[in-house]
UniProtKB/Swiss-Prot annotation:
Subcellular location: Nucleus
CC annotations in GO: nucleolus
DNA-binding: region residues: 175-189
Major subcellular site: nucleus
Enzyme class, broadest EC rank: hydrolase
Organism: Bos taurus
Enzyme Commission designation: 3.2.2.-
Role: Recognizes base lesions in the genome and initiates base excision DNA repair. Acts as a monofunctional DNA glycosylase specific for uracil (U) residues in DNA with a preference for single-stranded DNA substrates. The activity is greater toward mismatches (U/G) compared to matches (U/A). Excises uracil (U), 5-formyluracil (fU) and uracil derivatives bearing an oxidized group at C5 [5-hydroxyuracil (hoU) and 5-hydroxymethyluracil (hmU)] in ssDNA and dsDNA, but not analogous cytosine derivatives (5-hydroxycytosine and 5-formylcytosine), nor other oxidized bases.
InterPro entries for this protein: SMUG1 (IPR039134), Uracil-DNA_glycosylase-like (IPR005122), Uracil-DNA_glycosylase-like_sf (IPR036895)
Region named Disordered: 1-27
Similarity-based family: Belongs to the uracil-DNA glycosylase (UDG) superfamily. SMUG1 family.
Name under which the protein is recorded: Single-strand selective monofunctional uracil DNA glycosylase
Domain of life: Eukaryota
GO function term, MF aspect, one: DNA binding
């Protein structure tokens, strides 16, 4: 594994190739980000999946109100660091529209709310209850709980950082089991992640991101692949995923995360 480079200080390096129009004013940055997400939604609607996938949830559509509140409140200016997840979990973003969106954190720490509609197709084993969902998402509770303890207030975290998922879709088997993008047949997987990779490049440039931290190895690898040719000046690093399925994360993810952020030189950006 390559030795991580400390997070650089100083002015942001401009991309070698123009991917989009110059960055808008802070007032319209959130609007521009939301427009990019809607553009991605349009592209994703054109995709078709095999019988392996029974139902597709897109919380950026049916949980638009809390998702829009998240972006407009916390993405008002350029971001140096983007923490990148892979795709929604059934009890996190699928319920709240917020990446790693553990209900209690979204409601009580991020201060977000709003109506969440029922998806066009809803699996009986995966009901969408929005902020009324009683089940906790362990990954989200660990992720946001760590930053709540570290930063104190969400405004401290979001001064320089933002959290986003590469793919907005939750894929469910006919049984209701969660299907990761990695489980899709190769052609479908590359079609899906190809459009998400292209969207990521546009989003990274829009926000002025200098460092992408992939939360989990898959997100890190996809970010490297997406940005390597179009935006090679953007640094990509990884952070252990806080999943309860990870024995290493279960031994103390918070300590691992803090050590990793210290290696990357990010702690000064995350403390007041």
């Amino acid at each position: 594994m390559a030795v991580p480079q400390p997070f650089p200080s100083g002015p942001h390096l401009q991309p070698a190739g123009a991917l989009m129009e110059p960055q808008p004013s802070p007032r319209s940055l959130a609007e521009g980000f939301l427009q990019e997400e809607l553009r991605l939604n349009d592209e994703l609607r054109q995709l078709q999946f095999s019988e392996l996938v029974g139902i597709v949830y897109n919380p950026v559509e049916y949980a638009w109100e809390p998702h829009r509140s998240y972006v407009t409140r916390y993405c008002q200016g350029p971001k140096q660091v983007l923490f990148l997840g892979m795709n929604p979990g059934p009890f996190g973003m699928a319920q709240t529209g917020v990446p790693f969106g553990e209900v209690s954190v979204v409601r009580d720490w991020l201060g977000l709310g709003g109506p969440v509609r029922t998806p066009p197709q809803e699996h009986p084993k995966r009901p969408v209850l929005g902020l009324e969902c009683p089940q906790s998402e362990v990954s989200g509770a660990r992720f946001w709980g760590f930053f709540r303890n570290l930063c104190g207030q969400p405004e401290v975290f979001f001064r320089h950082c933002f959290v986003h998922n590469l793919c907005p879709l939750l894929l469910l088997a006919p049984s209701g089991r969660n299907i990761t993008p990695a489980e899709l047949p190769a052609k479908q997987r590359e079609q899906l992640l190809g459009v998400c990779d292209a969207a990521l490049c546009r989003q990274v440039q829009l926000l002025g991101v200098r460092l992408v931290v992939g939360v989990g190895r898959v997100a890190e690898q996809r970010a490297r692949r997406a940005l390597a040719s179009l935006m090679p000046e953007v640094q990509v690093e990884g952070l252990l995923h806080p999943s309860p399925r990870s024995p290493q994360a279960n031994k103390g993810w918070e300590a691992v995360a803090k050590e990793r952020l210290n290696e990357l030189g990010l702690l000064p950006l995350l403390t007041s």
